[in-house]
């Protein structure tokens, strides 16, 4: 959605109860409609407590509220998602379908905004499981753009039982040693700090059975740093290069078995300039991980026990 379309949407949007246009609505209804049309969600508590009183007091106009929302990082993310999002989604589905068969799976940060089966099954994991355990923050503790979904305790699906645990993925102490065949972390490690990431990888090592796998995909900082002012997600704490994340993973004792990239971005790196269209037009899984928009790992817990491996020799 462009800025122009967002504004036109507000001008043309009619309130379902009464057919009133935006200019005729009460301040409360106009405020809510601005969020629904521009950000595609209800107003959050912060906006309601800060912006709405100023609108009602005449300190802000409706046009200023609209401009504030259109200028937000969240709106820019929605605009990018309209083109790049579906392409990345396709590539991530390909990656998930390539993960090994497992009976018991731990999915870190795995709630799905619109599918209670969770991210792993929702994106096409092809094997039936005994159980998928999804660990994610309680909905009210997540960033506002991630509060949809993940409100169940369990769900029986055609692929197996899905159970939810609502707490930080940095604390896996509630799970027994060597109790999972596969751990999946899809677009979640970038939402926590570096020290917390070390806790996650140590926890993953402990709960994986010997020979078990960690599948992980995350933005590649070598590419996303070209974006700068239009940073992909307001909730990201840190994005890693291949070299940085490989070293962190291997310090936990896990071994990088396969390293791939999703959505080739080599042309952007050569030009030194990010192009959403270029990246969106190159979906798929690539061997040149350091030159892709997302990096995707398959890591293994060695049968012989913890042994720190030297970092993978890669660019980035």
Model regions and ranges:
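Substrate/cofactor-recognition hotspot
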Residues: 6-79
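Short alpha-helix
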Residues: 237-253, 259
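A short acidic, Gly/Pro-enriched loop at the edge of an enzyme's catalytic core
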Residues: 170-183
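Short, glycine-/aromatic-enriched active-site segment of Class I SAM-dependent methyltransferases
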Residues: 216-236
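A short glycine-rich, Lys/Arg-flanked "PGG" loop and its adjoining helix->strand segment in the class I
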Residues: 198-213
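Class I SAM-dependent methyltransferase SAM/SAH-binding core
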Residues: 110-172
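A C-terminal cap/extension of S-adenosyl-L-methionine-dependent methyltransferases
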Residues: 258-316
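Class I SAM-dependent methyltransferase Rossmann-like catalytic core
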Residues: 76-100
